[in-house]
Regions:
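Conserved beta-strand hairpin/beta-sheet module of binuclear metal-dependent hydrolase folds
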Residues: 1-49, 125-140
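Short, conserved catalytic or adaptor-binding loops enriched in Gly and charged residues
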Residues: 2-7, 105-106, 154
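A structural micro-motif
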Residues: 9, 55, 82-83, 110-112, ...
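Short gly/ser/thr-rich secondary-structure transition/capping motifs
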Residues: 14-17, 93-96, 117-118
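Short hydrophobic patches on amphipathic alpha-helices
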Residues: 25, 50, 77, 153-154
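Metallo-beta-lactamase
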Residues: 32, 40, 109-176
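Short catalytic-loop micro-motif centered on adjacent basic/acidic residues
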Residues: 33-36, 59-62, 114
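Active-site HxH/HxHxD metal-binding segment of metal-dependent hydrolases
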Residues: 40-107
Length: 176
């Protein structure tokens, strides 16, 4: 598990073994938001962490509906009944979002801009959390042109890019 301290709260990355996507947990005080659900064995790591630290999971944001990103969602939902956020083209989710929607959670301490990519999977989105300058990209890696467009169109300049698989990228020195 990787843990980073952020401007508002902390960010944890749970990496599962064999076929699982990363599951990210943003924690502010005793409340949490997950990005993707991973496979059940990765979700178990998240649930154990939530239980040990007495955290309430309020939302699960899905980047897309491939099995390795969603199979752990039911395990995550058992404990605190979080709301599941997904693109309108997804069959999953009870909060439907579209391109350029903004979802504010945990008393507005976290603010997620939804960016529809449509690449990789028809319901694929990125989530840009503006208070911490974090971009969750699922399985679609942005090009430098897309990062430039993101900055020009939305004033967003991510410092951390969090992929569905692999390690985070830190962009403090990248110019785009």
């Amino acid at each position: 598990m990787l843990k980073l301290d952020l401007k508002r709260g902390s960010l944890l990355c749970f990496s599962g073994r064999f076929l699982s996507s990363n599951v990210y947990l943003m924690v502010v005080e005793n409340r949490a938001v997950a990005v993707d659900g991973g496979m059940p064995w990765t979700a178990n790591l998240v649930v154990d962490y939530l239980n040990k630290n007495r955290l309430k999971l309020e939302y699960i944001f899905l980047t897309h509906s491939h099995f390795d990103h969603v199979m752990g969602v039911n395990r995550l939902k058992k404990r605190t009944k979080p709301r599941v956020v997904a693109h309108t083209r997804s069959k999953r989710g009870d909060v439907k979002v579209k391109d350029e929607d903004v979802i504010r959670v945990i008393d507005n301490k976290l603010s997620f801009l939804v960016l529809y990519t449509g690449f990789h999977k028809v319901d694929h989105v990125w989530y840009y959390e503006s208070n911490n300058q974090v971009l969750f990209i699922g399985d679609y890696l942005p090009t430098s042109t897309e990062l430039k467009t993101l900055r020009e169109r939305h004033g967003a300049k991510p410092k951390i890019i969090l992929p569905g698989h692999g390690k985070p990228a830190f962009l403090q020195t990248l110019s785009y």
